[in-house]
């Protein structure tokens, strides 16, 4: 991608040579959208909103959130966005700050609301940030750590979605 021109990207996609510029303002805009879609594959804002705004108790909402993450982790090998995300973790591009503002921050805010409802922690406290990290980071690890390696190194995590869920709760 880094060395490709917008025209080459369009040719490979079988679209008009000007499509990337027209729809995304250039290949940089396209890549920003790719990052947003990669994150959406793991957890869409719509799915998170549905969980957070449900009539369930905060603890039940956390369970549903974790179930969603575990299901995604069990199918992560089918998601092309995971490979993009892993590349960004290994070597962050200049597009990461906008991606965090656009895709990650709104979801993080929703997750903090849920954690606040469970813990009663002040929204901007260091303890809230740590609590959010302690929920979010294991979720990211499950999704991003390749299943073949996870199964090889930690065989008890393979195929035991219910066991993972109970342990995370």
Placement of each model-derived feature along the sequence:
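Helix-turn-helix
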Residues: 1-29, 33
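Amphipathic alpha-helical interaction surfaces
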Residues: 72-75, 91, 95, 110-117, ...
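Hydrophobic alpha-helical connector segments
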Residues: 47-79, 125-135
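Individual transmembrane alpha-helices with interfacial aromatic-anchor signatures
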Residues: 160-168
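Alpha-helical structural segments
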Residues: 12, 29-52, 60, 64-68, ...
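Hydrophobic alpha-helical segments that form the core
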Residues: 83-90, 124-146, 167-168
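Amphipathic alpha-helical segments used for helix-helix packing
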Residues: 76-101, 146-152
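Hydrophobic alpha-helical bundle segments that form small-molecule/ligand-binding pockets
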Residues: 104-131, 152
């Amino acid at each position: 991608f880094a060395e490709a021109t917008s025209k080459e990207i369009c040719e490979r996609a079988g679209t008009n040579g000007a499509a990337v510029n027209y729809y995304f303002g250039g290949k940089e805009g396209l890549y920003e959208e790719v990052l947003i879609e990669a994150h959406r594959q793991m957890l869409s804002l719509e799915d998170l909103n549905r969980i957070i705004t449900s009539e369930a108790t905060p603890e039940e909402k956390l369970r549903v959130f974790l179930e969603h993450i575990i299901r995604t982790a069990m199918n992560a090998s089918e998601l092309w966005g995971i490979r993009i995300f892993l590349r960004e973790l290994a070597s962050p591009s200049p597009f990461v700050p906008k991606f965090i503002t656009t895709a990650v921050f709104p979801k993080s805010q929703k997750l903090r609301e849920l954690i606040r409802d469970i813990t009663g922690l002040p929204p901007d406290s260091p303890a809230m940030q740590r609590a959010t990290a302690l929920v979010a980071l294991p979720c990211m690890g499950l999704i991003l750590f390749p299943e073949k390696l996870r199964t090889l190194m930690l065989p008890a995590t393979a195929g035991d979605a219910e066991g993972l869920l109970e342990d995370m709760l």
